[in-house]
Amino acid sequence: MPSPLRQLLELMIQAVETLESVCEEKGISLPDLHAPYTPASEAFLRIPAAIEAANVITAAADHMSAIVSPPTSYLYKFLGGPCRAVAIRACLESNVSEIIREAGPSGIHVDDIAKKNGHDAQKLARFLRYLATHHIYREVSPDVFTHSRLSCFFDTYKPSAEVIANPKQKYDNTRGFAAPASHHLDITFKAAALAWETMDDPKTGHSDELTDAPFARAFPEDKTLWNLLERDAFARNRFDLTMVAVAQRQSPDSIFRAFDWERLPAGALVVEVGGGMGTSAFPLATKYPEMRLVVQDLPDVIAKAEKLWTEKMPDALSSGRVVLQGHDCFAPQPQTDAAVFLLKMILHDWSDEYCVKILRQLRAAARPDTALVIVDCLVPLACRLDDAAEAALPGAVGPQAPPPLLPNYGTVNEYVYNMDVMMHLLFNAQERTVAQFTRVLLRAGWRVCAVHRTQEGNGVFLQSVEAVPA
């Protein structure tokens, strides 16, 4: 039998051949690592067969590295995490990406970068070289750096002089990766530094309280992220842009695949709990004109939503087909005729105890035939599951990589595990496995009946769990 290394190599070769064949058939090119990112360069990631091939290549490459690398070298990828974060933040906040973009493809010397942003040239060179070792930026000659496909994501595409002169407005009106990177490398990073102390403290280690999250230890004057965002306009704007970036990882019509909306009768009521501005309600209201929708959130959010709906879909409001309602999800649910309660990216903000409180309010207001639809990340296990688990609950297992790869595709889905840890750091909350959702829902009087997965998000990012009254 071939060695695991040989099996991984064969999987990688087959995946590369598939990827190249698909791209040739579609007349598209694979990205050039040395060329700036463009939406067109990522066109292959809209083809299902290419996505799967890319996932196998990525998982196999890291798996092979784990086999052949000296253990200490491989482990330093994790131990060196703070160093990577520091290097990225230094370049991000000192506006290196904007300066490099303006210099053009031939690059710019760190001395000239330093003249523009006022920072130490030698320190900038060390950070840039560290990142270039991971293909983030490129060192084209000694101390001369230019962009790579990856480093472009830290660029706001504003003039460097503007962001240098107005750092508090740097992320205003941007829609890229720079704002979320800044948020995570600032607030989340500081909370992470005290995660172990929080976990090891008998007073907080087993707590489900929001005010016992690692964030609270890092920011004792605020205690919760929401308090910090209320007092800090820059952090608030940056956080809002981070949420926009997360939403952009899914297509607007993804909500149509979260549930079989076609089965609802005309006039059915759908209540989106914690619906914000109504991101999910807009496409539903457009596609299903006979559907009634209630979007619930806190009053200040609903006030902003009313302005948006008045601009985008005023007839839906004036006709009463869409209602925007101020509501606290921990209070008794006023809507008692819902065909569907929809919660998208809500439960991951809360620990199990608080999720049960939210879900019990919905259960008390539910009809016998009410469906509960939860859209959140589904954390895959790192072990392989058999067919019995899938047979017991359709969609429970999700996609599994071919052996000898880890069944969860290894680092391909690392984003979801990052999200899980970030929820812990900021909110003492979590992303959940299907089994964890099942347990929480049962405690609140709901029974999971199906899991709806799509290849978008690799079957783990923002997928749907459907439940009915138990």
UniProtKB/Swiss-Prot annotation:
Do you know which PROSITE patterns this protein is assigned to? SAM_OMT_II
Example GO molecular function = O-methyltransferase activity
| Annotated signal sequence range | none
So which domain of life are we looking at? Eukaryota
- GO biological process, any: methylation
For the protein in the UniProt heading, the enzyme class is transferase
Give the enzyme's EC designation.
2.1.1.-
> What would be one Pfam family of this protein?
Methyltransf_2
Q: Which residues bind S-adenosyl-L-methionine?
A: G274, G275, D297, D328, C329, K344
Q: Give the positions the UniProt entry annotates as the active site.
A: H348
Keyword entries, A-Z: Lignin degradation, Methyltransferase, S-adenosyl-L-methionine, Transferase
Tell me about pH and activity: Optimum pH is 7.5.
Function, in words: S-adenosyl-L-methionine-dependent methyltransferase that preferentially catalyzes the methylation of 4-OH phenolic compounds like coniferyl alcohol, vanillyl alcohol and ferrulic acid. May play a role in promoting lignin degradation by methylating and inactivating free-hydroxyl phenolic compounds, products of lignin cleavage which are known inhibitors of lignin peroxidases.
Question: Which family, according to the similarity comment?
Answer: Belongs to the class I-like SAM-binding methyltransferase superfamily. Cation-independent O-methyltransferase family. COMT subfamily.
Protein name according to UniProt? 4-O-methyltransferase 1
